[in-house]
Structures are given as structure tokens and as C-alpha cells.
Amino acid sequence: MLVIILGVIGLLASSNLVSSSTSTRVGGHLPLTFDPPENELGYWCTYVESCRFCWDCEDGICTSRVWGNNSTSIIENDYVKYCEVSRWGDLCRYDVEEHIYHSMNCSDPKPWNPYKIARKEWKKDKHFRKELKKDEF
């Protein structure tokens, strides 16, 4: 019985050490969510930038929630995906809408973007919003 208790205490202690060592980047545990904390968007969006929570989209044009108007705007299409993210200790995980999962060590993250081919940058001179007249509805 004592061995089991000591084992559980050891697991909890190692989990806390991992959490505290990564807390400067992402901090503690995070239950599965479509809406990570605002102060963590830079982290989550750096490694899987196609997640919808990384973008503010209006009228088919999306601007980065992390880098704002100073970044390239994109056209809203299949590139922008609904993602859920979670963190347990040093394991960060993305669950993308097609039941695709990407896991990584939070303290040693790696970019992952299989949807990059679908990304289309919006250029003001090339893509313009058409003003419709009443009879064009």
C-alpha cells in the first residue's frame, strides 16, 4: 500500500515539475477547448496557424488575431479549420475538425500545417469585395 501511495505522489510531483517548467510558455493544464486563453494564442497559433481561433474572419477575409493588421490577410476557405486544443503536463494536443490529431511536447514544439496548400493570401488589388446593386441579389 505504501508503495502505491509513494508512486502516486511521485507521479504528481513529476507532473508539477513539468507544468512549472513550461508555465512560462503556456502554464499548467488546459482542458479541451475551442477557445484557448487570449494570452496563449501566440503559442497555439505559431505551431498550427490554420486553427479558426487564430483568425478574425469577416466577409470572407481573415486577419490574424495574434499579429493583427500587420500580418497578411487570408481568404476564408478550407485552410481555416475548427480546432480544439488541450494541455496536460508537457503534452500539447490539437484536435482538428476532421478528427486529425497533432500532439507535441509543449516545451519542444514543432510547427505542423498539412493545410498550407489551401492557404490563399488576400491582396487588395487582386481580390476586391464586389458591391452588389439591388437588382443583383
From Swiss-Prot:
<dbReference type="Pfam" id="PF01639">
    <property type="entry name" value="v110"/>
</dbReference>
<comment type="similarity">
    <text>Belongs to the asfaviruses V110 family.</text>
</comment>
<feature type="glycosylation site" description="N-linked (GlcNAc...) asparagine; by host">
    <location>
        <position position="105"/>
    </location>
</feature>
<keyword id="KW-0732">Signal</keyword>
<protein>
    <recommendedName>
        <fullName>Protein MGF 110-7L</fullName>
    </recommendedName>
</protein>
<dbReference type="InterPro" id="IPR004848">
    <property type="entry name" value="ASFV_fam_110"/>
</dbReference>
<feature type="glycosylation site" description="N-linked (GlcNAc...) asparagine; by host">
    <location>
        <position position="70"/>
    </location>
</feature>
<feature type="glycosylation site" description="N-linked (GlcNAc...) asparagine; by host">
    <location>
        <position position="69"/>
    </location>
</feature>
<keyword id="KW-0244">Early protein</keyword>
<feature type="signal peptide">
    <location>
        <begin position="1"/>
        <end position="20"/>
    </location>
</feature>
<keyword id="KW-0325">Glycoprotein</keyword>
